[in-house]
């Protein structure tokens, strides 16, 4: 029995994305696991049940997120011996990550931390911290500077 069969890799489309994908890819290769690239977009303000504004069933954000995930996969996964899929969700970030992990029965969650401290951490909080505290699954948190420049 393999330790990891399904790995969830949550990305934000920022400078941390290549590092997170790198770590997730290498673990997936080592264990022959399937990798799921996920981007969670915050719910739009008009998504509440009290809104009189109808929601597009396939909103622009999802198309944009999928296109960005496909670019990330092309740059860091294709031709690297890893089976992967792409998913998007619209939710609060930690909720979206945990929901996807549960839905796919992920064996591992990989995500980045930005190392916020002080007032910024107090006001914004940490998605990584919320995922770690609430997840029944192992979570690997990557600091972007942990991957040497040029290693993809």
Which residues are covered by each model-predicted region?
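Structural beta-alpha unit
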Residues: 1-2, 74-109, 146-152
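Short, hinge-like loop/turn segments at secondary-structure boundaries
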Residues: 52-56, 103-104, 127-128
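Glycine-rich, Arg-bearing micro-motifs that act as flexible, cationic patches
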Residues: 108-130, 148-149
């Amino acid at each position: 029995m393999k330790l990891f069969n399904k790995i969830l890799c949550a990305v934000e489309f920022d400078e941390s994305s290549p590092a997170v994908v790198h770590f997730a890819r290498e673990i997936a290769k080592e264990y022959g696991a399937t990798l799921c690239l996920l981007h969670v977009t915050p719910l739009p303000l008009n998504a509440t049940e009290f809104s009189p504004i109808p929601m597009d069933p396939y909103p622009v954000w999802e198309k944009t997120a999928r296109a960005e995930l496909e670019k990330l996969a092309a740059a860091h996964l294709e031709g690297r011996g890893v089976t992967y899929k792409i998913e998007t969700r619209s939710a609060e970030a930690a909720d979206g990550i945990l929901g996807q992990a549960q839905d796919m029965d992920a064996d591992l969650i990989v995500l980045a931390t930005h190392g916020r401290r002080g007032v910024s951490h107090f006001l914004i909080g940490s998605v990584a911290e919320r995922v770690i505290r609430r997840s029944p699954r192992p979570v690997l948190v990557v600091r972007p500077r942990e991957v040497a420049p040029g290693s993809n």
